[in-house]
Amino acid sequence: MAAPQGGYPPQEGYGQPAGYESPSQQAAGLAPAPAQHGGRKKRAYAGEAFELGSGANAGLGGQLPAGGTYGGYPAQPQAAGYQQPVYGADPTQMQAAAQGYAAPAAPAVAQMTQQFGAMGVTDPHLMPPQPVPQAAQAPRPVLNHLYPTDLLTQPFNVAELDYPPPPIVLPQGTSVYPSPTANCPPKYVRSTLNAVPTTHSLLKKSKLPFALVIQPYGALHDSEDQVPVIPDQVISRCRRCRSYINPFVTFLDHGHRWRCNMCNLTNDVPQAFDWDTTLQRPADRALRPDLNHAVVEFVAPQEYMVRPPQPLVYLFLIDVSYASVTNGLLATSARCIKESLERIPNADRRTRLGFIAVDSSLHYFSIPRDGSENSDPRMLVVSDLDEPFLPIPGDLLVTLSECRENIETFLDKLQEMFQNTQNNGCAMGSALRAGYKLIAPVGGKMTVLSSSLPNIGHGALTMREDKKVLGTSKESGLLQTANSFYKSFAVECSKAQVSVDMFLFSSQYQDVASLSNLPRYTGGQTYFYPGWNAARGEDAIKFAREFSEYLSSEIGLEAVLRVRATTGLRMSTFYGNFFNRSSDLCAFPAFPRDQAYVVEVAIDETVTKPVVCMQTAVLHTTCNGERRIRVLTLALPTTQSLADVYASADQQAIATYFSHKAVERALGSGLEPAREALQAKAVELLATYRKELAGGSVSGGGLQFPANLRGLPVLFLALIKNLGLRKSAQIPTDMRSAALCLLSTLPLPLLIQYIYPKMYSLHDMPDNAGLPDEQTGEIVLPPPVNLSSERVVPYGLYLIDDGQTQFLWVGRDAVPQLIVDVFGLPDKSQLRVGKQNLPDLDNDMNQRVRAVIEKSRDHRSKGCGSIVVPHLYVVKEDGEPGLRLWAQTMLVEDRADQGVSLVQWMGNLQEKV
């Protein structure tokens, strides 16, 4: 059997809810028991009086039995000397369980076996591991078992969101060689269904979507995520469907020919296929990377190039109006570019840079080569905004290697040139037009840094936000583009291999809805910094770190992406930031490494094969001027059983698909239709499961759903409550538009965290949390906590992190010693709230809290690239109300603003089902 998961251990009895049964929590994928660290004694900040299961890390069933554990963590011994003051209230009454939504006590094994037996299911923990089926025994292996659960009596446990997707169970001998890397790891490609229906009618009956979530790169730099590179330029492709040879082809005719696993055509094996070009001797075919690895990169020969590989080109369009000078953007960005010149990829020494400054005129800069007689940069001003022209086309884009010193001199002077400006104009649309003229012959990236609404020249926009329409049906109009220039110009850019990235910093309305069209159709991204000001150290540091990471990341250039599949399957719809050049070809002037794409798959003909394959290919030029093709091949079993389809469905991939659908609906029809569609879909899935797989009605009015999809209704509720979609009259349009950009571009792990943030209880962390793991050296995070105020105790300290923003929540009754240890302050009243960085103190608790905050920001460990460094806000429960309410919107299981609580949501779904 091919390896079921890239790097994930095969799971026995996948998806059984953890925290509801006593058996083997370890098998359920929860954290291991803490390692002992030299007998270090842990401070306990929660006193004896509150030790009755009301804390965040208490068991889901409320009170734990004596010596019980939750999530594999032993009960914490209390250290002396941190007695909790008694507040007069009975601590056991502090967190009444929500009515009708209390977790059951762990049932006895016999009782559970009986219950599962009644449903025709054996308890997965009691079953022996499934033997791998032999080819002779059964042509089709047993796919994942369906484990029904009741969403009302067994509430969702946040730890389930960290489970890997259901295993991909392939028949033995599916891959040509038995390689553990033959199938694509979920890090790169995830399917919403890990068992594919053989017919369109079965897919339609399931009501589940069939789509791929594709993230071709796992990091911003090759060194952090290495895949096998095949340098010999021998690329074997199917003559008919143009698929690349991969681990799932079949060799015939003594290995001289191969049968395509997509369309069944027989092809000749190229003559040089078994020759090692480096050592100039015959090679062992069984060792070829393209036959052993699902993810490979081919160095492309000449025929894959329309023109010589383009150099990396960055053209910076910098707002130099009054707003940009006063908030410090001009000075900070100039300094940051200067300090990052060393990090910009330039291995082939062809990288070119250009600069245009923008106010009510366009200011071009001619930068001479290093060592020239006159090393001063020249500024050329063009005030014709309708037909902006290039004053001296030759000297405006300069080679970084040849002009490095003079570029640094220019960046030092740039701030001084405009420091006394009073100009409020911003002709950014005209600057984009001029920039396009400058780099269209070679292609490249236009990086816009702006603090103003473009108010004159091409693409001029007006202040159209109206607080009276926020939260009403008219609000959706504000999310539409106000000027057609931004869409039509973006398409022009795409055709000329020009990509646009927007860095937006206004404290006023900036029309992110219109401006974000440029990145959307050119493979770029919109980075939004509301209320940014360089005078706040935290703001300046965040932007500097992110922009430096942005400039250093290894992007692909002049790229196209295509997905091919087994005969009978067709890629029908594509979601993400690119231009759809033809029915199945997505064009990227620049290919970023911090975005994901969703492709919907249609079943046009009945599939007769036991396995289908889908192959993603990204043809691109590396920053070093090499033409390459990255190929990712995913094989999935097929099934005629609806139970198999449901048992192998991936809740996180499904949530990602519906996130993209919801953004499309919000921009097309409005926010209310988008929210209604999500609720209707949740009801439809629950009703379908009840009717088709749970035997119609369920006694006792439960809400049945498979264990592997238990998080889906919660993720739908969290998506409806996300900043981009939730019903509220308090959300500025720019904030909402920026959130919609994230919902349609974030890689899957970051998207799930953005929809359902992570919350960690820090005052009662397990002993090993915040310290390096003895085996891996990685910092251990505490177990995550459900996003409900019922999990928050008044004496607690919590980290809430959605990947974009972090909140450090300080309870109103936090003990003084906790404040001393973490913040170095004698009294909570002296604790400043808002954006800040934690002080670095010489004590165990401070170091561990800092380590957890930093580890929670680490996107590399989540298997994806990102430049984002979240702000940390300190929030006091009894502090500034606005900040507190903002942090509380993260608790998506609570009732807030105009949204229902999880209990109400489940009740609504149950009524509608």
Curated annotation (Swiss-Prot):
Protein location: Cytoplasm; Cytoplasmic vesicle, COPII-coated vesicle membrane; Endoplasmic reticulum membrane; Golgi apparatus membrane
Source domain of life: Eukaryota
Keywords: Cytoplasm, Cytoplasmic vesicle, Endoplasmic reticulum, ER-Golgi transport, Golgi apparatus, Membrane, Metal-binding, Protein transport, Transport, Zinc
Region (Zinc finger-like): 238-263
Protein name: Protein transport protein sec24
A Pfam family annotated for this UniProt entry: zf-Sec23_Sec24
Gene Ontology molecular function: any one: zinc ion binding
Lineage summary: Eukaryota, Fungi, Dikarya, Ascomycota, Pezizomycotina
SUPFAM superfamilies named among the record's database cross-references: beta-sandwich domain of Sec23/24, C-terminal, gelsolin-like domain of Sec23/24, Helical domain of Sec23/24, vWA-like, Zn-finger domain of Sec23/24
Segments of this protein annotated with the region Disordered: 1-44
Record: residues binding Zn(2+): C238, C241, C260, C263
Subunit structure, as described in the record: The COPII coat is composed of at least 5 proteins: the sec23/24 complex, the sec13/31 complex, and the protein sar1. Golgi apparatus membrane; Peripheral membrane protein; Cytoplasmic side.
Annotated Low complexity bias: 1-37
Family: Belongs to the SEC23/SEC24 family. SEC24 subfamily.
Membrane topology: Peripheral membrane protein
Main location, first listed in the record: cytoplasm
GO terms of biological process kind: COPII-coated vesicle cargo loading; intracellular protein transport
GO cellular component terms given for this protein: cis-Golgi network; COPII vesicle coat; endoplasmic reticulum exit site; endoplasmic reticulum membrane; equatorial cell cortex; Golgi membrane
Entry function: Component of the coat protein complex II (COPII) which promotes the formation of transport vesicles from the endoplasmic reticulum (ER). The coat has two main functions, the physical deformation of the endoplasmic reticulum membrane into vesicles and the selection of cargo molecules.
UniProt organism field: Aspergillus oryzae (strain ATCC 42149 / RIB 40) (Yellow koji mold)
